[in-house]
UniProtKB/Swiss-Prot annotation:
GO CC, any one term: endosome
Protein name: Sodium/hydrogen exchanger 6
Amino acid composition bias (Basic and acidic residues), ranges on this chain: 515-524
Lumenal side: 46-49, 148, 201-215, 293-306, 362-382, 434-535
Organs and tissues of expression: Expressed in roots, leaves, stems, flowers and siliques. Detected at very low levels in roots and shoots.
Taxonomic path: Eukaryota, Viridiplantae, Streptophyta, Embryophyta, Tracheophyta
Gene: NHX6
GO molecular function annotations of the record: sodium:proton antiporter activity
Record-stated family: Belongs to the monovalent cation:proton antiporter 1 (CPA1) transporter (TC 2.A.36) family.
Chief place where the protein resides: membrane
Species the sequence originates in: Arabidopsis thaliana (Mouse-ear cress)
Annotated catalysed reactions: Na(+)(in) + H(+)(out) = Na(+)(out) + H(+)(in); K(+)(in) + H(+)(out) = K(+)(out) + H(+)(in)
Length: 535
């Protein structure tokens, strides 16, 4: 069978080469048809406000149905190979534009106003969820409740299954309207969560391959090297691009093509630089997106700003939709190991427990550091807990684990992850709208403007901390508040030094001019997008 799939004989055989080209054409045509169907169906569902089948769920279903039909009809192998989910293709071509757009579309005001909470949920919370899941899976195996895996492999599974994909929840937020703080928490946590999960998985994989001489301290050091190094590479590339566009004088009419080409190349430069340094390209391109939107974007001409915003939004939408179709087709075509149903059942139970430990534990810590008027209400914490759907990132890492782990172990993890992804995307994703309305965190009462939610400046945050009585012995709470103050100090540093240095705005951080106008073009917090038209 493998000899039939080799390309080299077809090169010398005109008929074989023609057959390969025909199979490629049919495969790509089917993919395009599924993309068109997915976008049209998503539009119809949005137009009729049918929230029980979100766009991501519809795309996954289309892939599952077409893949099932191809499997039943014994579609020709050369055509089916065009639908195989390759983790290299996913990580090199599909994921980078999605992650970059996540960072590029961040709104600076809500993100930095909730920066401490977002970092707590995404970094500490993801670490807690990974460790809790891995430990529970290991204990479940020891107690003969489920298929037993070695401890490090359990931690690898905990890391990959902690990668959340709340695209369904965010789309419903956009349709129904949501509290600005809640949207910022869910979106910000999801952006950094993927980067954290990938770094944890790669660290655990490295520990497994070099198990001798490793200890917990070295694991933490290796993880910090990967994460901080990748973040530094991304931020460095972003700042370099900002200075280039500030001083190169490209924002003139006859150089707009060059301006846009250079801007589009920088994200992939950041990604490949990190990968070449054995770091995480996903972490790097994420922070490149954040920095380029905050600094480089304002150095572009008005026409180039409109083009790059539309371009990255376009390719990320195509990639995201294609990923769910691609994933659904591959799930239907792959041979899964369903012999360990106990592993699947208890894994689902354990990730629910781990997600609760993540959200409610971190929520408690964040509320310790916040004044009364800034505490995260329990309804928001429940919504954040419910939004922890698993998606393409967990699926891709699980597929990679099939190659990283011994035969049987990786296949068991892949099958369990597949079941979890399908369950969360279809069932939980379909009930998200009802759940959010029951919690009363969406609706017209939450359609507040972006500025209304963040009028309190950093000095008022700091004053509220100083004025509150601090009971004796609350040193931990004091340290948490110092961390929150550092976020406010960074905002002041950005306003007074970084923005004037890296942009041509001369420090006009909060004015209603060009920079703020383009930041607010993509505000997702209202039902009908009428926020920018307010009087």
């Amino acid at each position: 069978m493998s000899s039939e799939l080799q390309i080299s004989p077809a090169i010398h055989d005109p008929q074989g080469q023609e057959k390969q080209q025909q199979a490629a054409g049919v495969g790509i045509l089917l993919q395009i048809m599924m993309l068109v169907l997915s976008f049209v169906l998503g539009h119809v569902l949005r137009r009729h406000k049918f929230y029980y089948l979100p766009e991501a769920s519809a795309s996954l279903l289309i892939g599952l149905i077409v893949g099932g039909l191809a499997n039943i009809s014994n579609t020709e192998t050369s055509i089916r190979t065009w639908f195989n989910f390759h983790d290299e293709f996913f990580f090199l071509f599909l994921l980078p534009p999605i992650i970059f757009q996540s960072g590029f579309s961040l709104q600076p005001k809500p993100f930095f106003s909730n920066f401490g909470a977002i970092v707590t949920f995404s970094v500490l919370g993801t670490f807690v969820a990974s460790m809790v899941t891995g430990l529970l899976v290991y204990l479940g195996g020891v107690m003969f409740l489920m298929y037993r895996l070695p401890f490090v492999e359990c931690l690898m599974f905990g890391s990959l299954i902690s990668a959340t994909d709340p695209v369904t929840v965010l789309s419903i937020f956009q349709e129904l309207g949501s509290d600005v703080n809640l949207y910022a928490l869910v979106f910000g946590e999801s952006v950094l969560n993927d980067a954290m999960a990938i770094s944890l998985y790669r660290t655990m994989s490295l520990v497994r391959s070099h198990s001798s001489g490793q200890n917990f301290f070295m694991v933490i050091v290796r993880f910090l090297e990967t994460f901080v190094g990748s973040m530094s590479a991304g931020v460095g590339v972003g700042f370099t691009s900002a200075l280039l566009f500030k001083y190169a004088g490209l924002d003139v009419d006859n150089l707009q093509n060059l301006e846009c080409c250079l801007f589009v190349l920088f994200p992939y430069f950041s990604y490949m630089l990190a990968e070449g340094l054995s770091l995480s390209g996903i972490v790097s391109i994420l922070f490149t997106g954040i920095v380029m939107k905050h600094y480089t974007y304002s150095n572009l001409s008005a026409n180039s700003q409109r083009f790059v915003s539309a371009f990255f939004h376009l390719i990320s939408s195509l990639a995201e939709t294609f990923v769910f179709i691609y994933m659904g087709f591959d799930i239907a075509m792959e041979k899964h190991s369903w012999s360990h149903l106990g592993f699947i059942f208890f894994s689902i139970l354990f990730i629910v427990i781990a997600r609760a430990a993540n959200v409610f534990g971190c929520g408690y810590l964040v509320n310790l550091a916040r004044p009364a008027h800034r505490k995260i209400p329990m309804t928001h914490q429940k919504a954040l807990w419910y939004s922890g759907l698993r998606g393409a990132m967990a699926f891709a890492l699980a597929l990679q684990s099939v190659h990283d782990l011994p035969e049987g172990h990786g296949q068991t993890i892949f099958t369990a992850t597949t079941a979890i992804v399908v369950l969360t995307v279809l069932l939980i994703g379909g009930s998200t709208g009802t759940m959010l309305e029951a919690l009363e965190v969406v609706g017209d009462s939450h359609d507040t403007s972006l500025g209304d939610g963040f009028e309190v400046v950093n000095s008022r945050y700091m004053t509220s901390y100083d004025d509150e009585d601090t009971p004796p012995g609350s040193g931990f709470r004091t340290k948490l508040r110092e961390f929150h103050k550092s976020a406010a100090s960074f905002t002041e540093l950005d306003r007074n030094y970084l923005t004037p240095f890296f942009t041509s705005n001369n420090g006009d951080y909060d004015d209603e001019g060009n920079m703020e106008q383009h930041h607010e073009e993509r505000i997702p917090f209202t039902r009908r997008g009428n926020l920018n038209n307010r009087g």
